[in-house]
């Protein structure tokens, strides 16, 4: 998917990108490849692959979820900024917070936000477990996203504490997601969530399966969650 195909594919979904926004994606791609030579940000560096598997894939959530109704977003373990920064480029009104435990990624994201001229974007170098216990952020976000490889039960413990009551947790997964969801149902309920919607689709060109789950926060997360750093991964609630 080249930049022109990317722009057309989004337009077909009702997301029209201006020349300035296309320039932001171009600069994002160039910086990603340049910085990737000195730090491991992504295994995907081919332009067409980046536009499809990073940019388009990140924005695909907006085909099913109306981002205009959200104000604050927190992206847990965003790595090189996915999915929140491509979404931010498309929906500039969003106030985005990104949490990642690797300091060098923060350096990249800071430089990237400055280069792209992104405002209302904040980066926090922290473990998700610690961040979720921080009163300044706990239950403060309209939407929390995770496009991560961790199991859904683990992601729920890391992300649900950050979602405000009535807000949403958006999980982006590849294949075998239904099985993961069944295992995570106990955890989702414990942390105050209810699975509201599930969307399944194929990524264009390569036709790989994608799943998006929208989990609504119906009640507050018990204070003891998230547990200490490392514990959710070692002893997932399932």
Curated annotation (Swiss-Prot):
Protein name in the entry: Ribosomal RNA small subunit methyltransferase G
Gene responsible for this protein: rsmG
SUPFAM superfamilies referenced in this protein's UniProt entry, alphabetically: S-adenosyl-L-methionine-dependent methyltransferases
Binding site for S-adenosyl-L-methionine: 77, 82, 128-129, 147
UniProt keyword annotations, A-Z: Cytoplasm, Methyltransferase, rRNA processing, S-adenosyl-L-methionine, Transferase
Family membership: Belongs to the methyltransferase superfamily. RNA methyltransferase RsmG family.
Functional description taken from the UniProt entry: Specifically methylates the N7 position of guanine in position 535 of 16S rRNA.
Matches recorded under CDD domains: AdoMet_MTases (cd02440)
Region (Disordered): 219-238
């Amino acid at each position: 998917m080249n930049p022109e195909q990317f722009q057309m594919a989004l337009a077909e979904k009702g997301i029209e990108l201006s020349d300035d926004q296309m320039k932001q994606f171009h600069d994002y791609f160039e910086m990603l490849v340049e910085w990737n030579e000195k730090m491991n940000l992504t295994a995907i560096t081919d332009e067409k692959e980046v536009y499809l598997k990073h940019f388009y894939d990140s924005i695909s959530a907006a085909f099913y979820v109306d981002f205009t109704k959200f104000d604050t977003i927190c992206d847990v373990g965003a790595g090189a900024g996915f999915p929140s920064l491509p979404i931010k480029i498309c929906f500039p009104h969003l106030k985005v917070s990104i949490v990642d435990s690797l300091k060098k990624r923060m350096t990249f994201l800071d430089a990237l936000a400055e280069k792209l001229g992104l405002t209302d974007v904040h980066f926090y170098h922290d473990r998700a477990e610690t961040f979720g216990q921080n009163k300044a952020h706990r239950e403060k976000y309209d939407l929390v996203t995770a496009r991560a490889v961790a199991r859904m039960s683990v992601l729920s413990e890391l992300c649900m504490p950050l979602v405000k009551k009535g807000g949403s947790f958006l999980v982006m997964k590849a294949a075998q997601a239904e099985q993961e969801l069944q295992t995570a149902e106990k955890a989702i309920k414990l942390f105050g969530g209810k699975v509201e919607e599930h969307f399944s689709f194929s990524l264009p060109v390569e036709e790989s399966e994608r799943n998006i789950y929208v989990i609504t926060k119906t009640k507050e997360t018990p204070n003891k969650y998230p547990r200490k750093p490392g514990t959710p991964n070692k002893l997932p609630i399932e």
